[in-house]
């Protein structure tokens, strides 16, 4: 009987403390500022409802129309980043293991003659098995647009203040990922 009375008193006391604590946390007294509430239309970059696409306005944009070989090469976003596609890609993006228009200019043996960026050594190496494929392109690399994307002529919605740091001048336009992949690991 004594134990159950003690348990009951402990329960009442702890409940009272919990209620006092919670009421202090939710009190509106004092000099607290109220948070600004945002409507659903103000959320995100689109400034439109998130429930349907009826009022979503997409600004007109165009991809580069410069032909391959005549376009400027973009500096990479960071060291060993996949290079962006600076040229027109009309008719080039239907890719399969058997047909890939990108390789007709970007394979190392033809890249210089085509004035194209050559595919790096990492594309001729199986990252899963660690096997050097001796000049054969890794089958995991045939879908070029998985990493490389054409650039549209648009104004960024958000200012990008990121400034990359490259360890060498050539890293701005070339990849040495296969040579640096295990840095700091071993």
From Swiss-Prot:
It is found in: Periplasm. It comes from the Bacteria. Transmembrane segments: none annotated. Gene3D superfamilies: Flavocytochrome C3, Chain A (1.10.1130.10). Keywords: Electron transport, Heme, Iron, Metal-binding, Periplasm, Signal, Transport. One of its GO terms (molecular function) is metal ion binding. Residues 1-20 form the signal peptide. GO terms for biological process: anaerobic respiration. Heme c 1 binds at residues 87, 102, 105-106. Electron transfer subunit of the periplasmic nitrate reductase complex NapAB. Transfers electrons to NapA subunit, thus allowing electron flow between membrane and periplasm. Essential for periplasmic nitrate reduction with nitrate as the terminal electron acceptor. Belongs to the NapB family. This is Periplasmic nitrate reductase, electron transfer subunit. Disulfide bonds: none annotated. The gene is napB. PANTHER family: PERIPLASMIC NITRATE REDUCTASE, ELECTRON TRANSFER SUBUNIT. Heme c 2 binds at residues 123, 144, 147-148. Component of the periplasmic nitrate reductase NapAB complex composed of NapA and NapB. Disruption phenotype: Mutants fail to grow by nitrate respiration and also fail to reduce nitrate and contain increased amounts of NapA. Binds 2 heme C groups per subunit. Pfam families: NapB. It comes from Wolinella succinogenes (strain ATCC 29543 / DSM 1740 / CCUG 13145 / JCM 31913 / LMG 7466 / NCTC 11488 / FDC 602W) (Vibrio succinogenes).
